[in-house]
Amino acid sequence: MSNAEHSSNFIRNIIIDDLDSKKHDTIITRFPPEPNGYLHIGHAKSIVLNFELGKEFNGRTNLRFDDTNPTKEDTEYVESIKEDVHWLGYNWSELHFASNYFDEMYKRALLLIKKGKAYVCDLTPEEIKEYRGTLTEPGKESPYRNRSVEENLDLFERMRKGEFEDGSKVLRAKIDMSSPNINFRDPIIYRIAHASHHNTGDKWCIYPMYDFAHPLEDAIEGITHSICTLEFADHRPLYDWFVKECEMESVPRQIEFARLNITNTVMSKRKLKQLVDEGIVDGWDDPRMPTVAGLRRRGYTPKSIRNFCKAIGVAKADSTVDSQMLEHFIREDLQETAPRAMAVINPLKLVITNYPEGESEILEIENNPKDESAGKRAVTFSREVYIEREDFMENPPKKYFRLFPGNEVRLKGAYFVKCNEVIKDENGEVTEIHCTYDPETKSGTGFTGRKVKGTIHWVDANNCIPAEFRLYEPLILDDCEENEGKHFLEQINPNSLTICKGFIEPSAKDAKPQDKYQLFRHGYFNVDPNFTSDDNLVFNRIVSLKSSFKLK
């Protein structure tokens, strides 16, 4: 990592202190997603943080699937998560499944029972919630709290054998029902769920709860720094309690950092699933989605996402990042790498009446005006071209420097043309415009006889490729996913997707899915991997060319 990427953050400082004090010889971090959905940009922040810390300090970073809830998890999500981590540029040291530790967790639960630190409770879920109390009122002890060790061992074993129905019994830690930390009020550590598991099949019908499983998983793997988001700060004392009372040999340290919030972006996995289930988007990889799969399909590069995650830093307090900051980093990346091309997404035919019929010529246009070494490409030019419909106005306002009757503009890399006639259909719609060109004004000849204020792009109507262009706006209208109690579906932007049919220059004839282009005056585009076929070229606009956003 460069010095910029080594910018200080409190987690990095903790690790440095731990290594300097010889508390640890090496560090081991982990990324522990639950395989119940697709990863989003918030997960990417955690991936980048954990893997970059492991890399910087010559440590290790594991990928662990926290698969303790069989009813919501699927191998589809396991595979997509593995793909996303690899795509972001990281290789895990070890791959683990929490479910592979179920035997060990069961043994540790038995240990808690034998120590008088856990009991089987028959209260209903509603009663457990009622007995727990509130933040201002202490909880009440369960009438089953003082069962004997022998009875608890017997009941827990029978729970494992499948003798009881779902929800009829749970195993709870025996801690303190009057604790000011509500997480300490005898939390559930095992529940009954007669459900087939994607990894263990039907071996188990009892499953550990997150607060019990997670610290044990970290300890089993020898994780030194267990990095999670702020909502788990109140759970840290419970995390430490389970590590201690389960007598784990390794003692990991939980550290919390602020989760990522982005303007105009839903970050809740539940809400993202709702968008998919209700058909508001066309899947988890819809280019409007903040999922890693969606960003990839939109055209974001791994480098741009990594640089974004590094730039936002690591904080102890929640804040919201401007979505334009993410756009800044993809522009920065593609500015250097994306080939240029001209495309017309809302075409209007322009006929050059004094250009020889049936003839054409080859023009050379620079690939990158800011980089001479990028060279030039050949583009054909003939009597008929397409221009953008918005580049012509019959009755323009002041300071409109594009094409209108009697005005002259430069066609990018070609000639000056002057509008002489407007052709309309029976409804008064402009269908084509007729112009004359000045052969003396060819680009690159050094012509200085007169100047024009407008330059517009075009494609040769006789040598271009039909294409579909998908233009995106934020899916969510408000700055936050929740605003003054509104339901987030009320904030869906009805104009989040606009589909245009147009043309692109022939240099794109060999474009393949995920190829990226800078289309002159339009922005950066990615060839869509889902909808593109041999006879249908589809481009997703990643971002426009410019933004008012400034990186501080």
UniProtKB/Swiss-Prot annotation:
Q: Where is this motif: 'KMSKS' region?
A: 266-270
An annotated GO cellular component: cytosol
Q: Where in the cell is it found?
A: Cytoplasm
Which residues take part in binding ATP? Answer: 34-36, 40-46, 229, 259-260, 267-269
Q: Which residues bind L-glutamine?
A: 66, 210
| Key word Ligase present | yes
Keywords, ordered alphabetically: Aminoacyl-tRNA synthetase, ATP-binding, Cytoplasm, Ligase, Nucleotide-binding, Protein biosynthesis
BP GO terms, sorted: glutaminyl-tRNA aminoacylation; glutamyl-tRNA aminoacylation
Main localisation: cytoplasm
Which top-level group of life is the source organism from? Bacteria
Q: List the disulfide bonds.
A: none
Task: For the motif 'HIGH' region, give the residue ranges.
Answer: 33-43
The Enzyme Commission number assigned here is 6.1.1.18
Q: How does it assemble?
A: Monomer.
Q: What does the sequence similarity comment in the record state about its family?
A: Belongs to the class-I aminoacyl-tRNA synthetase family.
PANTHER family xrefs? GLUTAMATE--TRNA LIGASE (PTHR43097:SF5), GLUTAMINE-TRNA LIGASE (PTHR43097)
**What is the protein name given in its UniProt record?**
Glutamine--tRNA ligase
- Which organism was this protein described from? Clostridium perfringens (strain ATCC 13124 / DSM 756 / JCM 1290 / NCIMB 6125 / NCTC 8237 / Type A)
Kindly list the organism's lineage: Bacteria, Bacillati, Bacillota, Clostridia, Eubacteriales
